[in-house]
């Protein structure tokens, strides 16, 4: 399904630019080129967002693979044509084939170069952060682990370029078997009604789990707890039908994806981690 990416800049604050993204698969040349770039993190124009201060701290703590710096959206519009740079930025993404106006906030790592449209810039990684209307406190506490994942992903595809496909994240489902030795942290509000209690979960999931708070997940990430994996759920929080609900299980220490899937939200499959997702984890 082809996503549409929108990005806002100072030059176009009163309008949005629609960008029809292709399902681009980075080549071996793209991957090699990335490691020669300086990575520029695009800061948000909205002074009310905490993203800017958080991402600065995260990059200082996590980013090791390239030199990095920070730029404004206006500078991004100028520098994105230069191949000596790569960029970390957030965008608004929708999926034309889904036939819904649902929009999501994605975090991208893309290469600069002579690309007229933003969607033509080669994506090294694109991760769903949140449904676009969700407050940033729903994802900000997970930014460190997601940036850590992006960095690790670049190293993985450098070492194993053969895994790079349109659905590259499906590769991480090979890690599902390792979940049985860890404790799965989940938020109650991110569980579907069929599995929203300890008793219901135990009927379908035999491994260790805990229904926790955001603070518990943030603490596990900060401590790099090797015994914890946690659910990163991206959905419209019950406000949309036919929208996508992404469910990703991430290691608090290694930032590895242990499970990656999404479903279309219906009455039968609501916005949340489903009974079928738990069953997928024990296959």
Regions found by a protein language model. Give the residues of each.
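Start-of-domain marker
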Residues: 22-106, 116
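Helix N-cap / beta->alpha transition motif
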Residues: 71-73, 213, 251
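Amphipathic beta-strand/beta-sheet edge segments enriched in Tyr/Trp
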Residues: 91-149, 218-283
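A charged, solvent-exposed segment within the mature domains of Sec-exported extracytoplasmic proteins
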Residues: 117-182, 190
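Flexible, glycine-rich surface segments
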Residues: 158-242
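Bacterial Sec-dependent N-terminal signal peptides
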Residues: 1-27
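Extended intrinsically disordered, low-complexity coil regions enriched in Ser, Thr, Gly, Ala
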Residues: 51-65, 195-205, 260
């Amino acid at each position: 399904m082809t996503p549409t990416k929108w990005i806002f800049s100072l030059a176009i604050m009163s309008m949005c630019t629609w960008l029809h993204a292709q399902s681009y698969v980075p080549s071996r040349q793209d991957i090699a080129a990335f490691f020669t770039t300086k990575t520029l993190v695009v800061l948000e124009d909205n002074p009310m967002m905490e993203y800017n201060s958080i991402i600065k701290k995260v990059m200082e703590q996590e980013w090791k693979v390239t030199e990095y710096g920070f730029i404004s959206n206006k500078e991004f519009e100028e520098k994105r044509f230069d191949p000596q740079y790569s960029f970390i930025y957030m965008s608004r993404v929708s999926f034309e084939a889904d036939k819904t106006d649902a929009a999501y906030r994605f975090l991208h790592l893309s290469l600069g170069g002579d690309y007229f449209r933003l969607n033509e810039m080669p994506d090294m990684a694109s991760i769903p952060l949140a449904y676009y209307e969700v407050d940033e406190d729903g994802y900000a506490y997970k930014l460190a682990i997601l940036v850590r994942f992006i960095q690790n992903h670049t190293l993985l595809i450098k070492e194993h370029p053969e895994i790079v496909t349109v659905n590259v994240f499906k590769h991480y489902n090979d890690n599902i078997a390792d979940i049985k030795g860890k404790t799965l942290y989940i938020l109650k509000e991110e569980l579907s009604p069929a599995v929203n209690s300890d008793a219901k979960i135990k009927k379908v999931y035999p491994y260790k789990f805990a229904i926790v708070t955001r603070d518990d997940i943030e603490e596990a990430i900060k401590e790099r707890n090797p015994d914890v994996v946690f659910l990163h759920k991206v959905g419209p929080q019950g406000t949309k039908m036919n929208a996508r609900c992404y469910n990703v299980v991430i290691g608090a220490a290694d930032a590895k994806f242990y499970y990656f899937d999404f479903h279309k939200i219906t009455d039968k499959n609501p916005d949340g981690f489903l009974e079928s997702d738990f069953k997928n984890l024990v296959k």
